[in-house]
């Protein structure tokens, strides 16, 4: 693994993953996470040389023994003479008590792999195992890690890590929308963390930014077990995810700002960040933000599969103001609005990106 090359070109890799490999039309879209919706609807293939370890609960203690057992079981599934199905044989769905620890190397796992689209290892709590198709996908404290296939057999694994923060206006979205994008980044030799966080209006500020901090604490404290090099830690965020990423970095890099906050924070800073189509100028009322998240255009009401879009969901929010859907008290509201005033020299190097027709382009230009 050419670690020096990866560190040098991290911003280029972020960009290439989002634009060239994921969806070239991204540059003409009105907003970044629309590309993720489109990618999902088009059913893009996942890279065969990337494995997803799914549904670790970052608000609970990591079961190191179980984590390593699942990787060992997954590796046993690689040893097969069925060369006609080599890619599919790398896939295995593992659900807690259904795992057979006596699984033999010469047993073909083809029957276990039917219908799976990509390499997946499920890490679900026993209480969720029976309902893995719903609870384990929607839990707001679940995370996935996307890893290069070499990670699974590397006994001394220590990979650079990218934390991806999904977008959706703080009230929409989940990790599944970003799984393809995260797998593409993992192809370059990274462990990519893809996670859910609490959404509004059910969860007000600071729930989302607290969850970002909880997540980063989790990977920091479990870096050795997870096989990550915390000294080479990066973040990428889209839309609301970009705002959360920037907000986390402001909090982590500015002790004065951090001292004013009355919720859980963490101070581990990423080396570099990539901010895609973010909303940063929270201190001013921006009609483009309201128009983007709250409009109800006929053309955008439904996705190509006929499902209700996020814009229709937005109409059900109590307030037309994004800030009111996100913030709670006047004091918290002011700190949220004034966050850009607290950017200092310790803020990590940032790669800012926006699409040509992005409604929030002015926000990126203002902080560039």
How should these model regions be labeled?
Residues 2-368:
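Alpha/beta-hydrolase superfamily serine-hydrolase fold, recognizing
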